[in-house]
């Protein structure tokens, strides 16, 4: 995980986020982060920047973010009052590649890997299509459900930072 992706519901106040799922487990056990350590973070469909680990409470952690403008929370939190706009750690995500991947639907085992790899490489548009050799049963796989696709794309995004 090269980028910790934060969601709207992770924010507890202006520039503080609290996470207690697989991301916090990864930060504590893989990164072996301690209080005061800096981590790369990004808001889904928003800015990329850094966060400082401020609190560890079991499997729950709190991060203080420095992400800049472009943070549009769906809550009543005012994020513009404590944001350092001139921070060297704040940046826009890379410009999307002008690329569309058109691919015949692969075996269900390969769907996860393809989605993760495409997200890691920055591919924004993926089109699965039917072809002569595609088994009709492949279209019934649960891996093509929206939440499963989203999960694999997020895993790839965490690696590629794009």
Label every PLM stretch briefly.
Residues 92-162:
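RNA substrate-binding interface of SAM-dependent RNA methyltransferases
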Residues 1-91:
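N-terminal positively charged helical leader segments and presequences
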């Amino acid at each position: 995980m090269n980028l910790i992706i934060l969601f709207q519901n992770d924010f507890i106040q202006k520039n503080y986020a609290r996470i207690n799922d697989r991301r916090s487990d990864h930060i504590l056990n893989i990164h072996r982060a301690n209080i005061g350590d800096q981590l790369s973070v990004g808001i889904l469909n928003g800015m990329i920047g850094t966060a400082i680990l401020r609190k560890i409470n079991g499997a729950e952690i709190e991060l203080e973010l420095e992400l800049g403008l472009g943070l549009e929370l769906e809550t009543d939190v005012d994020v513009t009052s404590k944001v350092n706009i001139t921070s060297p750690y704040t940046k826009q995500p890379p410009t999307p590649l002008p690329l569309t991947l058109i691919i015949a639907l692969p075996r269900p085992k390969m769907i996860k890997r393809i989605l993760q790899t495409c997200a890691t490489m920055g591919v924004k548009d993926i089109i699965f299509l039917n072809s002569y050799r595609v088994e009709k049963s492949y279209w019934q796989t649960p891996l093509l459900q929206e939440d499963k696709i989203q999960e694999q794309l997020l895993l790839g995004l965490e690696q590629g930072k794009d």
